[in-house]
Amino acid sequence: MPGGRRTAGARARGEVMLLSMSRTQFQDVLRRHPELANAMVGVLSSRLDNTNAQTFRDLTEKNRQLQTAYDELKAAQEQLIEKERLEKELQVAAEIQMSILPDVLPSPDGYDFGGRILPARQVGGDFYDVFDLGNGKMGVLIGDVSDKGVPSAIFMARAHALIIAEADNSTSPGAVLRMVNEHITRLEKSTQFVTALYGVLDLLTGEFSYARAGHEPPLLIGERGDVHRLPHEPGMALGLWEDMLLDENSIRLAKGSLLVMFTDGMTDCRDPNGVPFGLERIKETMKELRSLPAQAACDRLFSTLMDYQNGAKQDDDVTLLAIHAK
């Protein structure tokens, strides 16, 4: 039936016989043989069922693909929202930290101070301060709060404020830190703690009295250029227990000496191979800093540390605070 209407087509591969009948003849055959009509309906129904089943499978698969795409898009949106929330939280923490740090360090006669801080991933946990206590004395403070984020930044702000407030009530560094520890352990409900070193510098005599609450012992460049750690005993961080143990001591800063205080982010900073900077490298670098003012010494130490780090990931804040006796 070239060019005619058809429901199917076939191509013979050999000699065949073809039966041709009109619609009227075909309908007459079906009337005389209804079983043939039933068979044809059965074949067509089976083909329709198979077609419907395949269509259902195709639709089911497309729905599954659409659901997967929707779930992935939803997860990506949630990750983006969480990322934006964390970035905002980190920014708030950094702003709290920067608001605590002094804009300008004092420069009393005979001494100069220097400080540097490099937060890890915009998160603030370290702090430092130098403030006038009156009567020819200066308060010197450096600390490191456990953990990171906004809660730690708030905890840091409270600890800093408590130390400043108690420093007005006592010239004894140990008494100040004990009172602060009492406030923190009784009033704070968090599990955070803070290591700290608080000292009082007598500008007239050069005596530096200090108390160390679990913090890194300072390093001193003496009159002859030798570098050594200050004498130290065991001490505990603020906020751990009400009955705490402090390391208390005092030294005299002779003219030309340089005292450097730092947080453990300095010693723990690692190069691309994972090797920490360590205390000995700080000492070696400090041997070249004897004649420098405090701020220049801090800058040089930071520069040496960054060269050593060489782009490796920074896991903790790095903070320096220095006193130079002119």
Predicted features along the sequence, with ranges:
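Regulatory loop-to-helix N-cap segments in sensory/regulatory domains
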Residues: 2, 19-20, 25-33, 148, ...
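Amphipathic alpha-helical coiled-coil "transmission" helices that mediate dimerization
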Residues: 39-42, 46-88
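Short, charged, low-complexity patches
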Residues: 30-37, 41, 45-48, 152, ...
